[in-house]
Design a protein with these regions (language model features):
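Alpha-helical transmembrane segments
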Residues: 27-42, 84-89
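Pore-domain transmembrane helices of cation channels
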Residues: 117-165
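Structural signature of hydrophobic alpha-helical transmembrane segments
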Residues: 47-62, 83-84, 106-118, 178-181
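Short, Lys/Arg-rich, polar N-terminal cytosolic tail immediately upstream
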Residues: 1-26
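Outer-pore turret/helix-boundary of cation channels
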Residues: 49-51, 152-182
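Pore domain of cation channels
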Residues: 174-235
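Cytoplasmic-side transmembrane-helix entry/capping segments in multi-pass membrane proteins
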Residues: 77-89, 106-115, 134-145
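Short, hydrophobic transmembrane alpha-helix segments
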Residues: 42-56, 69-78, 99-100
Length: 236
């Protein structure tokens, strides 16, 4: 009883009210910028470019997305500069490898992309969990996480295809980045056209895991956020 009363008093305290009002006034455009960067990355990768330079450009786009997510989530400057350092090291190493004559740096660079795109959802979710209000900013952040998950799996499939000795897909030997991106989002949304299927056991297991996580995320997180946003609007 004492703990419940203490929690109630904290929520009703002026400082708590001020914090809630401050969160409500936080601009939604910050996660909107993250969303725009994700759409730009998606459009670039889906256009079907090929070559080592594609992975370098993807590092730039994913690095910018991670930095925007860190800024939108209110992360510390130390974490922000650490992310900048990782991106710069990856770009310098990848560019140097191309200049010295390394024929294929796609695999290592897409592993770096996997790290960057995997860190961004963690940062965003950590920020959203701490929020006391559900508003447009919260919903935009949750949508960013959903798209980031699809890109994370596409980079994971790309890495498997790059390092594996056998083709990733049963229907195609030389898959492009666009093919992996297409397969990932078709799997996550459970559309499942069937024109691409994973050939190996690891690819199939990850595809099933992506479909499960994607559907659970939609029917629980997004649905609950949107419904709560609607109730708040009617109550106000």
């Amino acid at each position: 009883m004492a703990l419940a009363e203490s929690a109630r008093q904290h929520l009703m305290s002026p400082s708590s009210s001020r914090e809630g009002r401050r969160e409500t006034r936080e601009p939604a455009y910050r996660f909107g910028i993250v969303l725009l960067l994700l759409f730009a990355t998606f459009a670039f990768l889906a256009s079907g470019p090929t070559g080592n330079w594609v992975a370098l450009v993807a590092v730039v786009l994913q690095g910018a997305t991670l930095l925007a997510a860190l800024s939108a989530s209110g992360a510390s400057r130390t974490l922000w500069w650490l992310a900048v350092l990782v991106v710069l090291v990856g770009l310098v190493a990848g560019t140097a490898a191309l200049f010295v004559g390394v024929k294929d740096v796609t695999g290592p660079l897409f592993l770096l992309n996997l790290l960057l795109v995997g860190a961004a959802p963690v940062v965003i979710v950590r920020s959203l969990v701490r929020r006391r209000v559900i508003d447009v900013r919260t919903v935009l952040g949750a949508l960013c996480v959903y798209i980031l998950l699809g890109m994370f799996w596409s980079f994971a499939f790309t890495a498997i295809g790059s390092f594996g000795s056998d083709p990733f897909f049963s229907q195609q030997n030389n898959a492009t980045v666009a093919d992996y991106l297409y397969f990932s989002f078709v799997t996550q949304t459970t559309v499942g056209y069937g024109d691409f299927t994973a050939a190996g056991g690891l690819g199939r297991a990850l595809a099933v895991l992506e479909a499960l996580i994607g559907q659970l995320y939609l029917v629980t997180v997004i649905a609950l956020l949107v419904s709560n946003l609607g109730r708040r609007g009617r109550e106000s």
